[in-house]
């Protein structure tokens, strides 16, 4: 049965939701480390997710921070058994969107407060930084925070978001080849291209087979709290708002690059059809939903 898998940081759960929204069940409980990104290995019947880790202590006037290095990646089987840690807690700082190239047996993810784009083998080995946007106290500048990621496996290119401060209109979407140029490092690549800047607060990405990049934005309206798309190949196009009115849009998933499922921190999953222009709420699971994926369980 095809279901949507969605992470809930408030309830510390992974929900499995029927495609028609008629049912929702708990697939994994006790997700105490603030889960965020999720990807499904259909062939091997595994589910991977990132954890942001424990949030920093203290009082917050806005959203909590995660400057402590305690991020991790976990994996579980489709039946909810054999849960184990793939990338140990503290290997990186804050796990955000997660994707994969299963043909190359690689996981890719963003480390927000760690200011980097990372990848590793499916078993957690061979961790390497592909992009590093800052170091030390530069993490206090949210313009350096990497969040969403997509991989073009054919062209060997990574796309990622740097969201900027909340509602500040300083977000960016960038891309670079997977392979770091000879003689360069992840922190001085010299081949990074900024596709769009001055975005409200871009979050998760999906690269469609037709050459369009689709992304969520949790920033201020009217351009924020939206789903957007723009062509990135063979040439760069203009960004277009496809759907509005979210309560901080986060996750995005699709099976056909036409119908998209979108989660938000308000607890809603909406389904939008880009060809027909339809847009409706599928289900509301209560705050706070993050990453979203599709699985044949």
Describe the predicted segments one by one.
Residues 23-29, 82-89, 126-140, 190-196, ...:
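A short beta-strand motif characteristic of beta-propeller blades
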Residues 263-297:
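Blade-level signature of beta-propeller repeat domains, shared across WD40, Kelch, NHL, RCC1
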Residues 120-122, 176-185, 230-234, 273-275:
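Short loop/turn segments immediately following beta-strands, especially the blade-tip
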Residues 9-10, 52-54, 112, 122, ...:
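Short loop/turn segments immediately following the C-termini of beta-strands
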Residues 2, 31-45, 89-105, 135-156, ...:
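Beta-rich, blade/repeat-based domains predominating
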Residues 13-15, 62-65, 71-74, 116-119, ...:
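A short loop-to-beta-strand structural motif that recurs across blades of beta-propeller domains
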Residues 50-68, 158-172, 217-221:
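Short, conserved, GDST-rich strand-edge loop motifs in beta-rich repeat architectures
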């Amino acid at each position: 049965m095809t279901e949507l898998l969605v992470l809930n940081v408030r309830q510390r759960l992974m929900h499995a939701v029927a495609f028609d929204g008629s049912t929702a069940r708990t697939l994994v409980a006790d997700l105490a480390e603030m889960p965020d990104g999720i990807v499904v290995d259909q062939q091997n019947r595994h589910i991977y997710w990132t954890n942001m880790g424990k949030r920093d202590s203290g009082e917050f006037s806005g959203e909590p921070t995660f400057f402590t290095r305690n991020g991790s990646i976990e994996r579980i089987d489709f039946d909810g058994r054999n849960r184990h840690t793939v990338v140990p807690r503290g290997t990186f700082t804050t796990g955000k969107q997660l994707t994969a190239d299963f043909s190359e047996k690689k996981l890719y993810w963003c480390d927000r407060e760690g200011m980097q784009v990372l990848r590793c083998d499916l078993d957690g080995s061979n961790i390497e930084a592909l992009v590093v946007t800052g170091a030390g106290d530069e993490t206090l500048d949210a313009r350096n925070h990497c969040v969403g990621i997509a991989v073009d496996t054919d062209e060997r290119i990574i796309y990622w978001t740097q969201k900027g401060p909340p509602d500040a209109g300083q977000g960016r979407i960038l891309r670079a080849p997977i392979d770091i140029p000879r003689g360069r490092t992840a922190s001085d690549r010299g081949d990074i291209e900024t596709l769009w800047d001055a975005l409200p607060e871009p979050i998760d990405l999906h690269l469609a087979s037709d050459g369009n990049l689709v992304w969520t934005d949790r920033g201020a309206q009217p351009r924020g709290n939206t789903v957007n798309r723009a062509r990135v190949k063979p040439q760069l196009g203009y960004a277009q708002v496809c759907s509005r009115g979210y309560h901080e849009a986060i996750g995005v998933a699709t099976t056909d690059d036409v119908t998209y499922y979108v989660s938000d921190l308000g607890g809603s999953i909406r389904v939008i059809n880009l060809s027909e222009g339809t847009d409706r709420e599928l289900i509301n699971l209560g705050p706070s939903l993050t990453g979203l994926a599709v699985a044949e369980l």
